[in-house]
Swiss-Prot record:
Organism encoding this protein: Bordetella petrii (strain ATCC BAA-461 / DSM 12804 / CCUG 43448)
Residue ranges of the region described as Flexible linker: 137-141
Region described as Domain III: 142-190
Annotated InterPro entries: DNA_helicase_Holl-junc_RuvA_I, Hlx-hairpin-Hlx_DNA-bd_motif, NA-bd_OB-fold, RuvA, RuvA_2-like, RuvA_C, RuvA_C_sf
Keywords: Cytoplasm, DNA damage, DNA recombination, DNA repair, DNA-binding
NCBIfam families in UniProt: ruvA
Domain statement: Has three domains with a flexible linker between the domains II and III and assumes an 'L' shape. Domain III is highly mobile and contacts RuvB.
Subcellular localization: Cytoplasm
GO cellular component: cytoplasm; Holliday junction helicase complex; Holliday junction resolvase complex
Name listed for the protein in its UniProt record: Holliday junction branch migration complex subunit RuvA
Family: Belongs to the RuvA family.
One GO term of the biological process aspect: DNA repair
Broad class of where this protein is predominantly found: cytoplasm
Record gene name: ruvA
Source organism, top-level taxon: Bacteria
């Protein structure tokens, strides 16, 4: 098993990158979150990896953090979730957001990810309950109810999870739901 790769980033063709390790180029599939975290071409990178061996291919998946790789490994254990769908989930949600959605049993957050329908989201929540949240302490970092309501409102209005989370962080502590939505929308429009 190839657990980690360090080398020079020589190509970015989403969702695949190529890392040169001593003259050998490794094609690695990465979630968009990892792709955005990568430095410019020619820079040195280290990725935590997962190797999938199939009859017709050996595919290397790369992640910026060990937590992301761990989440990927848990996701592909869920029936109906393959590697592509797992990458899609990690592209749409951070590991902490995924753990929080699992802990709070929020299927709505999962169904916003391409390739995840209502039944798949419910199965994912059921099969992953207690597996991911315990690893990163999602229950300790659970968002208060008003913030969850604000986040859900922003997501329903079509803003991405990343944009919505960024707007939430800018809100003053203890902001009510209606005031929070108003302030968040104001911040997002700028």
């Amino acid at each position: 098993m190839i657990g980690r790769i360090t080398g020079t980033l020589i190509e970015k063709l989403p969702p695949t990158i190529c890392v040169d390790v001593n003259g050998l180029g490794y094609d690695i599939e990465v979630p968009m979150s990892t792709l955005y975290a990568l430095p410019e071409l020619g820079a040195r990178v280290t990725l935590h990896t997962h190797l999938t061996v199939r009859e017709d291919a050996h595919i290397l998946y790369g992640f910026a953090t060990a937590a992301e790789r761990g989440a990927f490994r848990e996701l592909i254990k869920v029936s109906g979730i393959g590697a592509r769908t797992a990458l899609s989930v990690l592209s749409g949600l951070s590991v902490s957001d995924l753990a929080q959605a699992i802990t709070l049993q929020e299927s709505g957050r999962l169904t916003r990810v391409p390739g995840i329908g209502k039944k798949t989201a419910e199965r994912l929540l059921l099969e992953m309950r207690g597996k991911l949240g315990a690893d990163i302490g999602a229950t300790a970092h659970a968002v208060p109810d008003s913030q969850t309501d604000i986040l859900n409102a922003l997501l329903a209005l079509g803003y991405s999870d990343k944009e919505s989370q960024a707007a939430l962080k800018k809100l003053p502590e203890g902001t009510g739901v209606s005031e929070g939505i108003r302030l968040a929308l104001k911040a997002l429009v700028r």
